[in-house]
Amino acid sequence: MRPSQKQITPEQLAFAQAHALVRIVDDQADLREALSFVLDMEGWKTISYGRAEDFFTGDSPSEPGCVVLDVRMPGMSGIEAQHEMRSRGIALPIIFLTGHGDVDMAVGAVQDGAFDFLLKPVDNERFLNLSLIHISE
């Protein structure tokens, strides 16, 4: 069964929403706010960071959930943040965001453990489905 076809029970959804945190790491404030709004309206807990460095200093990776991570940001890139997460033993699922359809980069990120890749502008329904799937795993 493909991840997009995974069935989630209402009980699994309620448990995930009560215990999981979606971390949004993107340098675009308007996108962070929009993604947080979409998730908040569906009952998810979110926290946003404008830089990967802020994520590493401000987050508690022991709290379950996932990371929505922009590929290209000033300072530490999303790909560099993925490698840093791995070196620190942070095993949260990653959904990458990019405004650039770089297939080689996407393949490399998935091979390094990313769970999915979304192109900007983000399709809200696909974003919600991917978040639910990866948080519930």
Task: Describe every region a protein language model picked out.
Residues 1-23, 29, 36:
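Non-catalytic signal-transmission and effector/linker regions of two-component phosphorelay proteins
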Residues 50-51, 76-80:
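Acidic catalytic/metal-coordinating carboxylates
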Residues 62-68:
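Active-site beta3 strand of CheY-like receiver
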Residues 73:
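Receiver (REC) domain active-site loop signature in two-component systems and cognate sites
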